[in-house]
Amino acid sequence: MPPKSRASGPKKTQKSRRRDKKNVPHGNAHIKSTFNNTIVSITDPNGNVISWASSGHVGFKGSRKSTPFAAQLAAENAARKAQEHGVKKVDVFVKGPGSGRETAIRSLQAAGLEVGTISDVTPQPHNGCRPPKRRRV
């Protein structure tokens, strides 16, 4: 019996992913700001993501990801990509305790998006998980 060749089987062709332009005039901006990073997602009213950016995606590494400036650049990047899909007005949902919350909202406005409502959706535990121990510096 001849040995099996590894190249047998159907060839996989690379399928090019085409970005179709969605025309969504109104969307939601979800800003998740943690102690280590800030993630900005802009979605349509159904919750499907139109564009996103994070501090790490913009090019920051390590402790610089948690700065307000990194959050500002991430929000500008996400807003620019969303405007290509026709987004003009957003409602903002902010989650988390991080330092980039207000800066991200301001930079969404500065990028040309009209901000409607701003709501804080940070989850509050009803005495759930034990929090991490306090740092002694």
From Swiss-Prot:
Record's keyword annotation contains Nucleotide-binding: no
Gene Ontology cellular-component annotations: ribonucleoprotein complex; ribosome
Compositional bias (Basic residues): 12-21
Segment forming the signal sequence: none
The entry's keywords: Ribonucleoprotein, Ribosomal protein, RNA-binding, rRNA-binding
One Pfam family recorded for the sequence: Ribosomal_S11
UniProt-listed Gene3D superfamilies: Ribosomal protein S11 (3.30.420.80)
Residue numbers spanned by region Disordered: 1-32, 118-137
Family that this chain belongs to: Belongs to the universal ribosomal protein uS11 family.
Subunit structure: Part of the 30S ribosomal subunit. Interacts with proteins S7 and S18. Binds to IF-3.
PANTHER family tied to this protein: 40S RIBOSOMAL PROTEIN S14/30S RIBOSOMAL PROTEIN S11
Matching HAMAP family: Ribosomal_uS11 (MF_01310)
Protein name: Small ribosomal subunit protein uS11
Biological source species: Nocardia farcinica (strain IFM 10152)
Name of encoding gene: rpsK
